[in-house]
């Protein structure tokens, strides 16, 4: 999750349970700033931040494509290009109670990119949301492809509040308190030593070192966020404070390069963007 961009909320709504509105072609462009880069709460040791220009096009057929340009900076490096991610997918017809999508992503990082998730080269995902007046429930699953394949699942609860502004045409403020949990497979090498007892005659015992491949499925993080989005006509701005709590960090003895770093952390995502609709 290189960038956590926030789209403009939908101001119009309907009361029926059919398709919410006739689909339109939508072009979206935004710039996102993330104060502390993380991937499921995992961070690099340099406390990097990032800037992510994003462009996307949603076809009225449901097909869509998104390109994200990744720039990172930290105490040892000024803002520099680190890679590009490309996502293509299909959004299911949206109704009063359902929305969802399937997507495939390709990540193209530079050789010098120091990003926690840079080992992931491709990803396939499916997400579905059940919407009601109390809480929206989202579930998702994904396959992450690197030197090996990992499975991830996510669950999210949120409730969207939209306040239309009087005196300003086509404007609103949206607040969307959100709680999320992410789980997935973890594959790593574990080495441990076992000492055997001495034999008769007083000879010392021996120490045997054993290495094994470990494949586990664990909770990876909990995250709480409160996106606040301001929309005026075709333009929008968002500020998303978030608190992430990583779980089950991998620690490999004497191999820090194979270990994960992370702790409970607060960070902010800021977004400005433009959304254009046309038939």
Describe each PLM feature range.
Residues 29-31, 55, 65-67, 88, ...:
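Membrane-embedded beta-strand positions of outer-membrane beta-barrel proteins
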Residues 9-72:
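Short glycine/proline- and aromatic-enriched beta-strand/turn motifs that initiate or cap beta-hairpins
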Residues 45-47, 78-80, 118-120, 147-149, ...:
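Short sequence motifs at beta-strands and strand-loop junctions characteristic
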Residues 16-25, 93-100, 134, 162-175, ...:
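Short loop/turn motifs that connect adjacent beta-strands in outer-membrane beta-barrel proteins
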Residues 157, 262-279:
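Outer-membrane beta-barrel "beta-signal"
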Residues 1-14, 272-279:
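Bacterial Sec-dependent N-terminal signal peptides
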């Amino acid at each position: 999750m290189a960038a956590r961009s926030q789209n403009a909320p939908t101001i119009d709504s309907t009361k029926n349970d059919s398709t919410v509105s006739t689909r339109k072609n939508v072009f979206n462009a935004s710039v996102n700033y993330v104060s502390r880069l993380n991937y499921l709460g995992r961070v690099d040791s340099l406390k990097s931040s990032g800037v992510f220009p994003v462009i996307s096009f949603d076809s009225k057929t449901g097909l869509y494509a998104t390109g994200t340009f990744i720039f990172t900076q930290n105490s040892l490096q000024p803002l520099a290009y680190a890679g590009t991610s490309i996502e293509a997918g299909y959004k299911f017809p949206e109704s009063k109670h359902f929305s969802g999508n399937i997507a495939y992503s390709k990540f193209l990082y530079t050789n010098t990119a120091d990003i926690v998730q840079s080992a992931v080269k491709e990803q396939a995902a499916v997400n579905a949301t059940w919407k009601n007046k109390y809480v929206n429930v989202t579930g998702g699953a994904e396959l992450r492809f690197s030197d090996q394949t990992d499975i991830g699942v996510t669950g999210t609860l949120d409730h969207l509040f939209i306040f239309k502004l009087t005196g300003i045409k086509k404007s609103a403020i949206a607040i969307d308190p959100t709680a999320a949990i992410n789980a997935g497979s973890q594959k790593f090498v574990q080495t441990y030593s076992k000492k055997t007892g001495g034999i008769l005659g007083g000879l010392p015992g021996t120490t045997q070192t054993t290495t094994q491949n470990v494949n586990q499925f664990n909770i990876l993080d909990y995250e709480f966020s409160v996106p606040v989005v301001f929309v005026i006509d075709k333009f929008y701005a968002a500020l998303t404070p978030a608190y992430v709590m990583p779980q089950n960090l991998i620690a490999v003895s004497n191999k820090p390069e194979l270990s994960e770093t992370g702790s409970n952390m607060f960070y902010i995502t800021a977004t400005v963007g433009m959304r254009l609709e046309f038939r």
